[in-house]
Curated annotation (Swiss-Prot):
The keyword Transmembrane helix applies. One of its GO terms (biological process) is transmembrane transport. Disruption phenotype: Strongly diminishes production of asperfuranone. Belongs to the major facilitator superfamily. It comes from the Eukaryota. The gene is afoB. SUPFAM superfamilies: MFS general substrate transporter. The chain crosses the membrane at residues 40-60, 107-127, 138-158, 165-185, 206-226, 248-268, 278-298, 321-341, 378-398, 413-433, 486-506. It comes from Emericella nidulans (strain FGSC A4 / ATCC 38163 / CBS 112.46 / NRRL 194 / M139). This is Efflux pump afoB.
Length: 538
């Protein structure tokens, strides 16, 4: 990359445009006193457990959702049970990058966000109706915004660059373990205990399960020191300046933009027709507000929540779009395969959880009430392997591209779009499912003795309480057809992962001494080291 004019005043993110800056980063890294021994072990264990809980929470919910819809008579809210979580996370994600850049990683950020996440889980466990449960999911999502960003920021702070890729892979592996075991754990509690604490027995276990591990995470973080990428003054000393630098006006624009757009998708075809003024107004209003947000971010320059200078780099926007579609593909399948097994196959939540421990789409769109066990197991294993291949590379790319002080903001961009993608896809999948189910039930009205509205309102686990015999067979066919149409959405988002992932590039970081010298135009340091881990970068 060509050098910029020396008279140009460089902003805080311009350093990633200069290869000579990487040598300064390397020198600074050698001066950092990284924790070692039991201290680094405790810190990394807490980060790994936090990632495990983050993904476990998502996976437990996917299996418990059919039982929740029956408890609250709220099948039309399925999209919001997952989407509300992603909405809370996405709305706060850009702000977390600014917070981590201003305040201590441990004392004022990671722990606070983790506590918020745990409080959201407690509220979900205590929920007595669908709106209360959705509010709990939003609060948990807000906490997860800081957890996901903080985990990556912490790894960058406690490990030298050449070790970060390896541990990031291990960390993501634990996250995938949470996705794999979550459906089984959630199914076991839903089957044998119930999904929350409103029954006489141990009904709290489903959503309280992360509290014991959460106490371990909090304890490990509380009694250890995490080195900062750059010195930070005491919180009270910089509070006024820090608040001004958080770009709260930008936050007040992105929040309503996301909420309006997702509400429009949720209301369309459910509470209001798609061509109603309410739906059109929400979607258009959300888009217009997002446009104002982009203008505001451009005007703020390097002080914005989402600095445009970072978005100029191919690796960053490629990673953002890859994760936008990647998490979407996983969550859509998690939620609707659970409905397939519990509604159509009449499996218990435990059996359903075991079935969705891996996920798949192109072949899954062929599922029917008579699909053999060998097929649905094979389909899911195939996609489970594929989805795992896309997990770690975008995060490792960002860690090796961006100077340490800017990693929180870069990660905030990636995770923001990841969560926006998940929220939009879940709400869109819910719209496709609910509208398709109503259409399919209407087509089979002569075979069904109960109104389509009553079937939709009853929830997944209550179908067999309403209909039986030939009417039940017709209802199950309608469910299967609606789920197949949701899987077509999964095919589309999976293809988009293929479209954007090549933007991560194919650079071998084993041959690069100063990893942060890698930039979007292909600049690369001299080949001097051979002992680090390879990763696709751009």
């Amino acid at each position: 990359m060509a050098e910029t004019d020396s008279s140009h005043t460089r902003g805080p993110v311009d350093s990633i445009q200069k290869n000579d800056a990487s040598s300064d980063d390397a020198e600074a890294e050698t001066k950092i006193q990284y924790p070692s021994g039991w201290r680094v072990t405790m810190i990394l264990t807490s980060v790994t457990l936090a990632y495990f809980l983050f993904f476990l929470d998502l996976a437990v919910l996917s299996t418990a959702t059919p039982a929740i819809t029956s408890q609250f008579d709220s099948l039309v809210d399925v999209g919001w049970y997952g989407g509300a979580y992603q909405l809370g996370s996405a709305a706060f994600q850009p702000l977390t990058g600014k917070i981590y850049s201003q305040f201590s990683i441990k004392q004022w950020t990671f722990l606070v966000f983790f506590i918020v996440f745990e409080l959201g889980s407690v509220l979900c466990a205590a929920a007595r109706n669908s709106p209360m449960f959705i509010v709990g999911r939003v609060i948990a999502g807000v906490g997860s915004a800081g957890m996901s960003n903080g985990a990556v920021t912490t790894i960058s702070a406690v490990l030298p660059t050449q070790k970060q890729a390896l541990f990031m892979g291990l960390n993501m592996g634990m996250g995938q373990l949470g996705l794999a075991t979550g459906p089984i754990i959630g199914g076991a509690f839903t089957t044998n205990v119930s999904w929350r604490e409103d029954a006489p027995a141990d009904d709290d276990a489903g959503f309280y399960i992360n509290l014991p591990l959460g106490a371990v995470v909090g304890g490990f973080l509380l009694f250890n020191t995490i080195p900062e990428p750059k010195p930070k003054a005491p919180p009270l000393q910089i509070l006024g300046t820090a608040i001004r630098s958080l770009d709260l006006p930008g936050f007040m624009l992105i929040c309503p933009a996301v909420v309006m757009f997702l509400l429009g998708l949720q209301f369309g075809g459910n509470e209001h027709p798609w061509d109603s003024s309410v739906v059109i107004g929400l979607i258009v209003g959300g888009g217009a507000t997002f446009g104002v947000f982009l203008v505001h971010q451009w005007w703020r320059g390097d002080e914005a929540m989402v600095p445009f200078a970072l978005l100029k780099h191919k690796v960053i926007w490629s990673a953002a779009m890859t994760m936008f579609f990647s998490l979407s593909s996983v969550l859509v399948a998690d939620f609707y395969i659970a409905i397939y097994f519990q509604a159509i196959r009449d499996d218990s939540p435990l059996m359903s959880g075991g079935a969705i421990s891996a996920v798949g789409y192109g072949l899954l769109s062929t599922l029917s009430p008579t699909t053999s066990v060998a097929k649905w197991v094979g389909y899911q294993i195939l996609y489970g392997v594929a989805s795992g291949c896309t997990t770690a590379a975008p995060y490792v790319a960002i860690q090796n591209l961006v100077p340490a002080p800017q990693i929180p903001q870069a990660m905030a961009i990636i995770i923001f779009w990841q969560n926006i993608g998940a929220a939009i896809s879940l709400i869109a999948a819910n719209a496709i499912f609910s509208n398709s189910l109503r259409d399919q039930l209407a087509q089979r009205a002569s075979q069904i003795t109960v109104s389509p509205g009553a079937i939709v309102a009853a929830g997944v686990r209550s179908i067999r309480d309403l209909v039986s015999g030939s009417a039940l067979a017709a209802v199950l066919e309608a469910y299967a057809e609606a789920i197949d149409r949701v899987m077509y959405l999964g095919i589309a988002v999976s293809v988009m992962v293929i479209v954007f992932s090549p933007g991560l590039g194919w650079k071998d970081i084993r041959k690069t001494k100063d990893l942060q010298a890698l930039t979007s135009d292909g600049a690369q340091g001299e080949a001097t080291e051979k002992e680090t881990v390879p990763v696709a970068l751009g």
